Each structure stands twice: as structure tokens, then as C-alpha cells.
Amino acid sequence: MSYTSTDSDHNESPAADDNGSDCRSRWDGHALKKGPWSSAEDDILIDYVNKHGEGNWNAVQKHTSLFRCGKSCRLRWANHLRPNLKKGAFSQEEEQLIVELHAKMGNRWARMAAHLPGRTDNEIKNYWNTRIKRRQRAGLPLYPPEMHVEALEWSQEYAKSRVMGEDRRHQDFLQLGSCESNVFFDTLNFTDMVPGTFDLADMTAYKNMGNCASSPRYENFMTPTIPSSKRLWESELLYPGCSSTIKQEFSSPEQFRNTSPQTISKTCSFSVPCDVEHPLYGNRHSPVMIPDSHTPTDGIVPYSKPLYGAVKLELPSFQYSETTFDQWKKSSSPPHSDLLDPFDTYIQSPPPPTGGEESDLYSNFDTGLLDMLLLEAKIRNNSTKNNLYRSCASTIPSADLGQVTVSQTKSEEFDNSLKSFLVHSEMSTQNADETPPRQREKKRKPLLDITRPDVLLASSWLDHGLGIVKETGSMSDALAVLLGDDIGNDYMNMSVGASSGVGSCSWSNMPPVCQMTELP
């Protein structure tokens, strides 16, 4: 059976006139038809498939006069023109098979159609969608109870088979690329990678950790604040051997905060800068810092309070925001010696050495801040006072030595009267070679450091609260306590010599900070 298309037949088709401008042929420029198929077009397609077989649907228009695209010809043959195609409704066996296949495969209609000869994927899809709506309206389950369990088991097995197939393909790819596919991390210990509850990187107040802290180079070292993502590795590098012990001793941050510093120092084998007996300032013999300035001074000036968190570095300052001088005037008793305690260590320390030992002192105070300037001025003043004392000692008459005893007696009486007004600060024990015998026996009284530039502002509370600053021997006794008993006696001898009329020891030659009134 052959069919020859004529121009009259093509022109008589209304679909060709309407859709001719939308779809063009790729090789002869003729318009392709769209829409429903006619019986004549079905005969042309059947004759072509019988002669050439199925496949290469784009060649149908080339070998015949059928103006249809290849996709349209394929769908027309598969869904309507095949000789083994079944028409009509699905049988009960086919419906049962469709439910089982859908429970295993899902919406893979083409694969399901391969198991149903004579049925198309479109028919199976239409049947399933109709069945879903019908069972939903009736309130019935989509799958039978015994088939639903099988579907779940099959879906798990199918998912495993897919994963195994993908792994096999990846393994083949790795083997083609000369790579090792089987890589196991058996020796990797993930417990070491988990950060503990107690991190040494947070302890910024604990400096001079370990044995290396005794070196002068590391005396002013402070641990910086490190992000949590980097603390694990860097903390082990800074403090090896402490992480494992701390993780065993402390299970929570609350337990660490409630634990005394002595226990922590025994655990990690490093010195703790805080003492339980001095909660405000800490231990004054430990590596500490200036209050409110956070400047390390290697044990000379203590902390204002123990710190456990991050510390913001600031420049040193003697401006105390919490306590003002006006509040000192209003108080009935002298203020606590909190502001003066940091400078008691200067008084308790022996006179600064001269000569070659000054370089060691400068190395300990090598902070480049106000502490360096104060120490340098103090050393220079001591050297000037010693020179003046040598020049004045030779000219003091022997008859005036009795006045020295009188002045010493007045200074001792002033010390006794001062005890009832000033608050005594506890003095920690020191070594015998570092502290004179007299300083170990007598408790230290908080006195003003006249070398500081802001001492004049703080001296106003003595005028109103005590009323004893105007006494003649107050300044001499303060210098005696500040610079040591021996140097204080030197100043008293110099004052006696000046009252005797010695011209070579005039007070105008002294530095402004060391001038004092003459004793009567």
C-alpha cells in the first residue's frame, strides 16, 4: 500500500495552514504538521515501519511525504499503531502487577511498561493516577498491608544497591587515576581533637608558666587571647604536659573557679599570682602588674585583683576612678591603704645598688613606661643625697650630736602616734638577705610616696583627717621610712647641721622633691 501526497492534499489540511509558520523542516523548508493524526498519515507511518523497521524516526519525513517530526512519529507508533498493542482496561493480574512494580520502582513508568507486554508507559501512568484519586476518595490505603512492608524492605535494598553501585564506579575511577581508594584512619584518635572544658589559653592572668618563665626575657610575657578554633593546638604548644593533667583534674569551669590557686599550681607545676590571704591584690611576691594599667613589673607592684579572663592592655595610669580625694576628706578615718600598698614594696625593698648592679635593676624594670622614669629619678636622688651627706658629715660639731638623739626621739613618738590613725597593711615575710632586721620586726605603715607627681593631691586628706602633717618631724620620718633607717638618720643629721650654721650644706642645693623643714 502506497500513498502519494499531493499539493492539493497538503493545502486542504487546515492544520497546515494554521501551524505552517511555527514549525519548519530542517532540510527542504516545508512546514510540519501539528495536531491530531489523520488515517492517511497513520497508513504512511505503518508502511514505512514495515519496510525499514523501528528506529531513526527523523528519516521518516526524508523517505516519505509525511510532514511530521521524528518525535511525533515515534509516539504515534508506540502508543497507537503497534501490532501487539493491547487496548481496553487493565485486567486484575495487570493491576496487581502494577501495584507491586510501583511499590518497588516508584514512578518509573517506562521500566514498568517493559514488564507489561502490549501496555504503554502512558497507559500505566494514567491508570495509577486514576487509582490514587479513587482510593483517596474511598479512604482506602494505596498499598495493601502485606505489600507495604515489602515495599519498604525493597526500597532499603534498592537504596543500598544504588550506593554500592556508585561506590563501585568511584572505586573504578580512583583505580584508573592510580589513587588508593581504601584509606582508613584507624590510628587517628579523635578524643585528642576535642577541646576540653578548661583551656590554658584563657588564663591570661597566669603568666610565667613552666620552667622557661624564670628567664628575664619571658618575665613580662602575657598570653594573648586566642580564638576558640585555634586554642587547642596553640595551648599545647605553649604549655606542653599540662593539658592532659588539667582535663583529668577539672571537669567543668565551675569546679575550676571553686578550686584554690594552690591546687592549680600543684596540678600544672607553675606559679599562681594570686594568694588566698590577699584577694584584692594577690600575692605581692608573685609576678604581678600595676593596678588599672595591666603592665607587668615582675613582682614589684601587685595586681588590683586576680584576673581569669582576657586582659586589655592599656598604658599605665595613676588616676583611680573608684576613689577620689573628695571622698577621703569626708571620711572620719583615714582611707584604707589600698592605693598605697602597691608602693610599700618600694619601701620594703633595700636601697638600690650602685655601680654595676644598676644594670640589673634596669633590666627588671625595662617596661619603657612611667615605672622606669620613677626608678631612675629615685636612684639619682639617692646618689645626690649620699654625696651631700658625705660633705656635711665632716662639718657637724660634736656638741650637736645630742640634738640628733632628740630628733630621733621625736620621730619615734611620731611613729607611735601615727599607728592610731593609719590602717596597718600586713607585711609578708621576706628573706633575711633582702630585708633589714628592723624592718622585719616592725610592721610597715602605709605612707605616701613623695616621688610620685600626684602625691600633693592625695596629701589633702592628711590635713583634714589627721591634723598632724604640720608637725616638724613628719616629713623627715616619712623619708626615713621610705629610704631606710640609715638614710633617714642621714637626713636628720643634715638638718641638725644646717641649724648649726654650716654653710656648705644649704638646703637650696637639694632636689625640690627632697626639701624638708628644719627641726627645732
UniProtKB/Swiss-Prot annotation:
* Gene name of the record: MYB33
Can you give the residue ranges of the HTH myb-type domain? 29-81, 82-136
The cellular location(s) given in this protein's UniProt record come to: Nucleus
InterPro entries named among the record's database cross-references: GAMYB-like, Homeodomain-like_sf, Myb_dom, SANT/Myb
Which Gene Ontology terms describe the biological processes this protein takes part in? Answer: anther development; anther wall tapetum morphogenesis; gibberellic acid mediated signaling pathway; negative regulation of cell population proliferation; negative regulation of growth; pollen sperm cell differentiation; positive regulation of abscisic acid-activated signaling pathway; positive regulation of DNA-templated transcription
- Report residue spans for region: Disordered: 1-24, 331-359, 426-447
Q: What is a single Pfam family found in this protein's UniProt entry?
A: Myb_DNA-binding
Question: What keywords does the record list, in alphabetical order?
Answer: Activator, Developmental protein, Differentiation, DNA-binding, Flowering, Nucleus, Repeat, Transcription, Transcription regulation
| Effect of a null allele | Hyposensitivity to abscisic acid (ABA). Reduced expression levels of aleurone-related genes (e.g. CP1, CP, GASA1, BXL1 and BXL2) in seeds. The triple mutant myb33 myb65 myb101 has a male sterility and exhibits slower protein storage vacuoles (PSVs) vacuolation rate in aleurone layers upon seed germination. The myb33 myb65 double mutant is defective in anther development, with a tapetum undergoing hypertrophy at the pollen mother cell stage, resulting in premeiotic abortion of pollen development and male sterility.
**Function summary:** Transcriptional activator of alpha-amylase expression that binds to 5'-CAACTGTC-3' motif in target gene promoter. Positive regulator of abscisic acid (ABA) responses leading to growth arrest during seed germination. In vegetative tissues, inhibits growth by reducing cell proliferation. Promotes the expression of aleurone-related genes (e.g. CP1, CP, GASA1, BXL1 and BXL2) in seeds. Together with MYB65 and MYB101, promotes the programmed cell death (PCD) the vacuolation of protein storage vacuoles (PSVs) in the aleurone layers during seed germination.
Tell me a Gene Ontology molecular-function term this record carries.
sequence-specific DNA binding
Which stretches does UniProt call biased (Low complexity)? 331-342
Q: What's the source species' lineage?
A: Eukaryota, Viridiplantae, Streptophyta, Embryophyta, Tracheophyta
Q: What induces it?
A: Accumulates at the shoot apex upon the transition from short- to long-day photoperiods leading to flowering and after gibberellins (GAs) treatment. Repressed by microRNA159 (miR159a and miR159b) in vegetative tissues. Specific expression in floral organs and in the shoot apices is regulated via miR159-mediated degradation. Repressed in germinating seeds by miR159-mediated cleavage in an abscisic acid (ABA) and ABI3-dependent manner, probably to desensitize hormone signaling during seedling stress responses. Slightly induced by ethylene and cytokinins.
Protein name as catalogued: Transcription factor MYB33
Q: CDD domains recorded for this chain?
A: SANT
Which is a Gene Ontology cellular component entry for this protein?
Answer: nucleus
PANTHER family for the chain: MYB DOMAIN PROTEIN 81-RELATED, TRANSCRIPTION FACTOR MYB33-RELATED
